Amino acid sequence: MRVTAPRTLLLLLSAALALTETWAGSHSMRYFDTAVSRPGRGEPRFITVGYVDDTQFVRFDSDAASPRMEPRAPWIEQEGPEYWDRETQTSKAQAQTDRENLRIALRYYNQSEAGSHTIQRMFGCDVGPDGRLLRGYSQSAYDGKDYIALNEDLSSWTAADTAAQITQRKWEAAREAEQLRAYLEGTCVEWLRRYLENGRETLQRADTPKTHVTHHPISDHEATLRCWALGFYPAEITLTWQRDGEDQTQDTELVETRPAGDGTFQKWAAVVVPSGEEERYTCHVQHEGLPKPLTLRWEPSSQSTIPIVGIVAGLAVLAVVVIGAVVTAVICRRKSSGGKGGSYSQAASSDSAQGSDVSLTA
């Protein structure tokens, strides 16, 4: 669930902000809010999505025919009507707050009302294997650039520019960090524990990665060795290449972990090697689903085009998923507004899992 945090300053998260990874054995809950203005086409659109670890579990879209917080995972559907009513009202309040925030931001940055602008925010908490808070965070952005962020001490702010410094001063005067910290250490952790228990079969599972190495000639003198890990969960994984036992980190091309479209993830790491020296290179894979790290080599006799076909198909699905996720995430971070003074603020409510409203009121 998300709780509404007290009113003061907080806004804007970078459009490129991605889900951050947690430590092994830890779990996270995050909400991503986005408000986008669209002059001449009605009120700004507001979307929020909630994630537990790498699984989306709720979503709200102000453009829906009947805007409500909606379930996105089977295990959250067991929550009763009061939960959905409360989360819906929290999201609607945040949507209204962010609409005001967008207007205030125009004044902060001396911008015209003719253009489209975006406010984004990510906030949430991580807990360790013992269920205790490891880290809390709240980061905001405006038009894809950092705006203001809660520091790791959960008691101070880092402002990215002079406009954000206005917000920082107002939040400090209102002791906004204290209220947000209370949410992160209390409500956020409590709801995360509840979700982990209710969704334990999904959220606390460990799907073992399917691994193999492929060989791709570049010229008569060089070839690319690519180490694949497919179908794993959770998303945290380590792929490294070694040459004669020495890490090749600087020479490794490593892609970001990607959703496969079926609730699992994919990743690969590649190195360019001299032809004829392939046997000197080993790929090392570490993942929660493995009893011990794997060591792989390219086996010339075992290479097949079948895995590649499967990967291409998976990446095709991935493309659709990523596009949808980007649209959602870039249209899904949560801010709240209120008032005309020109100061961002958050509003906290005691029993909503969402965490905090952000608004620019004086």
UniProtKB/Swiss-Prot annotation:
Chain positions carrying an annotated carbohydrate: 110
Signal peptide, first to last residue: 1-24
Stretches in topological domain Cytoplasmic: 333-362
Taxonomic placement: Eukaryota, Metazoa, Chordata, Craniata, Vertebrata
Domain of life: Eukaryota
SUPFAM superfamilies: Immunoglobulin (SSF48726), MHC antigen-recognition domain (SSF54452)
Localization terms from the record: Membrane
CDD domains, sorted: IgC1_MHC_Ia_HLA-B (cd21026)
Protein name per its UniProtKB record: Class I histocompatibility antigen, Gogo-B*0101 alpha chain
